[in-house]
């Protein structure tokens, strides 16, 4: 039987930060482009993934057992190294699952750490695509940095000169990902290995849109600029992020938000994997209090070490007014008329969408950034790790929709925090940022438009046509045999 409906198999790295954008892409391919989609996820993420797909047809979830890597990698290895080993060890099981299907998928879509699965394409006769859930700036640096000669690398890493990238804004030394600054460490070689594999696919999908990153996308698509390194089509398919869920608005924070004036509340969250030291938490609390602005703070215990962690254990008790011990004594009492504290987790997208929210102090993870833009909310950029410094530079220097901390690796004083908060929430500069981000929000909505020929929709239409042509060729070969 000749198969006419394209079938995409998607292979996601572990962790919901990786899985959720993959799920949103799967839903888009199924609902708007006629794909049947099979998403392969590790068992640790399976339950959460199923809950995100309750109302989605045309998308199947296949669980893969989580490989035991305890004897394969140092327990203290970088998270990039650990994820890469997990994905590599899962490839044989992925292959078995695909081979067991009645018909091989038309295309295999991997994310940034799934490059070991590219070898399956030739064997099983599939197209392959790399999905970068981050942005075009990240993609550009990722594919360009490994091609640099040692002299240029030394100018950047030793002499701390900005990294010049064809057709793009230069990247400051302070903004480059830490992994690129340690060429003798395993994490550097692991990251470079993945990045060098991206151009081996048939195309690269990136979670951005033309108006968000015009220079980087133009360079990636120009064969005289970064396109000569990418070597394959680069498709902007964003913004892809979790949709707002009306069912989550029964959280008590919304009762409080409903009583606040429009655009008067600053939302503060460093994401599920970000943390501050005890000293920095104290300075942040004092800065918020002295700013005299309304706020919602998703506050977690301090971690005096790396700013990157997956989980946080409860630490310390509370004082008599329920102020956590790691915050200034009496903080909750003194700010109770204008502040709302949330431990651990909050319905972020729904909070940002509320009319009372007028600013977002964020770690600049790409998903959080997209949620803020889609809600028309300007930001205070406080990056912590990975590509977040580059994201912060994009938001503040290129787009003008955020203010930015001077150096997130140094302690930020309460006076600087107060000034940033007031700038976004109470001064003319904040109003200008708000105007710009709302305009950018409108372009994001246009990008997603099905009937208006939005750039994201058109990009996926091109991918769909490529898959359909491939299906026709496979069918012709089958009939010829």
Swiss-Prot record:
It is an enzyme of class 2 (transferase). Its EC number is 2.4.1.111, 2.4.1.126. UDP-alpha-D-glucose binds at residues 346, 348, 363, 366, 368, 371, 387-388. SUPFAM superfamilies: UDP-Glycosyltransferase/glycogen phosphorylase. An anthocyanidin binds at residues 18, 386. It comes from the Eukaryota. PROSITE patterns: UDPGT (PS00375). Expressed in seedlings and roots, and at lower levels in flowers and siliques. It catalyses: (E)-4-coumarate + UDP-alpha-D-glucose = 4-O-(beta-D-glucosyl)-trans-4-coumarate + UDP + H(+); (E)-sinapyl alcohol + UDP-alpha-D-glucose = 4-O-(beta-D-glucosyl)-trans-4-sinapoyl alcohol + UDP + H(+); (E)-coniferol + UDP-alpha-D-glucose = 4-O-(beta-D-glucosyl)-(E)-coniferol + UDP + H(+); (E)-sinapate + UDP-alpha-D-glucose = 4-O-(beta-D-glucosyl)-trans-sinapate + UDP + H(+). Keywords: Glycosyltransferase, Transferase. The keyword Transferase applies. The active site is at 18 (proton acceptor), 111 (charge relay). GO terms for molecular function: coniferyl-alcohol glucosyltransferase activity; hydroxycinnamate 4-beta-glucosyltransferase activity. Belongs to the UDP-glycosyltransferase family. PANTHER family: UDP-GLYCOSYLTRANSFERASE 72E1 (PTHR48046), UDP-GLYCOSYLTRANSFERASE 72E2-RELATED (PTHR48046:SF5). Involved in the O-glucosylation of monolignols (alcohol monomers of lignin). Glucosylates coniferyl alcohol to form coniferyl alcohol 4-O-glucoside. Glucosylates sinapyl alcohol to form sinapyl alcohol 4-O-glucoside. Possesses low activity with sinapate as substrate. This is UDP-glycosyltransferase 72E3. It comes from Arabidopsis thaliana. The lineage of its organism: Eukaryota, Viridiplantae, Streptophyta, Embryophyta, Tracheophyta.
């Amino acid at each position: 039987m000749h198969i006419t409906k394209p079938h995409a198999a998607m292979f996601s790295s572990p962790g919901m930060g990786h899985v959720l954008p993959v799920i949103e892409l799967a839903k888009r391919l199924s609902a708007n482009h006629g794909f049947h989609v099979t998403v392969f996820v590790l068992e640790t993420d399976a339950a959460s993934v199923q809950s995100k797909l309750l109302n989605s047809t045309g998308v199947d979830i296949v669980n893969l057992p989580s490989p035991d890597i305890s004897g394969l990698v140092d327990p203290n290895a970088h998270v990039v190294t650990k994820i890469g080993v997990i994905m590599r060890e899962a490839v044989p099981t992925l292959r078995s699952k695909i081979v067991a299907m009645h018909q091989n998928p038309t295309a295999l879509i991997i994310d940034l750490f799934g490059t070991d699965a590219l070898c399956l394409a030739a064997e099983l006769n599939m197209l392959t695509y790399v999905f970068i859930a981050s942005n075009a700036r990240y993609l550009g640096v990722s594919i360009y940095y490994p091609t640099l000669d040692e002299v240029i690398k030394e100018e950047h890493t030793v002499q701390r000169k900005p990294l010049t990238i064809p057709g793009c804004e230069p990247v400051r030394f302070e903004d480059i990902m830490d992994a690129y600054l340690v060429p003798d460490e395993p994490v550097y070689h692991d990251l470079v290995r993945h990045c060098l594999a991206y151009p081996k696919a048939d195309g690269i999908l990136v979670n951005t849109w033309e108006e968000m990153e015009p220079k980087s996308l133009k360079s990636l698509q120009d064969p005289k600029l970064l396109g000569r390194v990418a070597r394959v089509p680069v498709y902007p398919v964003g913004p892809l992020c979790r949709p707002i869920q009306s069912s989550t608005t029964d959280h008590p924070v919304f009762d409080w938000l409903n009583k606040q004036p429009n655009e008067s509340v600053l939302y503060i969250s460093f994401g599920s994997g970000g943390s501050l030291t005890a000293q920095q938490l104290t300075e942040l609390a004092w800065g918020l209090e002295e700013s005299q602005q309304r706020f919602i703070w998703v506050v977690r215990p301090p971690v005096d070490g790396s700013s990157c962690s997956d989980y946080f254990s409860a630490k310390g008790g509370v004082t008599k007014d329920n102020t956590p011990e790691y915050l200034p004594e009496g903080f909750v009492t003194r700010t109770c008329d204008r502040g709302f504290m949330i431990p651990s987790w909050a319905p972020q997208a729904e909070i940002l969408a509320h009319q009372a929210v007028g600013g977002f102090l964020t770690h600049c993870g790409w998903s959080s950034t997209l949620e803020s833009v889609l809600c028309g909310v300007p930001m205070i950029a406080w990056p912590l790790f990975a590509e977040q410094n580059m994201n912060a530079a994009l938001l503040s220097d290129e787009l003008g929709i955020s203010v930015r901390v001077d150096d997130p690796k140094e302690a930020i004083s309460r006076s600087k925090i107060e000034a940033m908060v007031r700038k976004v929430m109470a001064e003319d500069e904040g109003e200008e940022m708000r105007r710009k981000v709302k305009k950018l929000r409108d372009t994001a909505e246009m990008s997603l438009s099905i009937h208006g020929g939005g750039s994201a929709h058109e990009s996926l239409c091109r991918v769909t046509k490529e898959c359909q042509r491939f299906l026709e060729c496979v069918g012709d070969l089958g009939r010829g045999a």
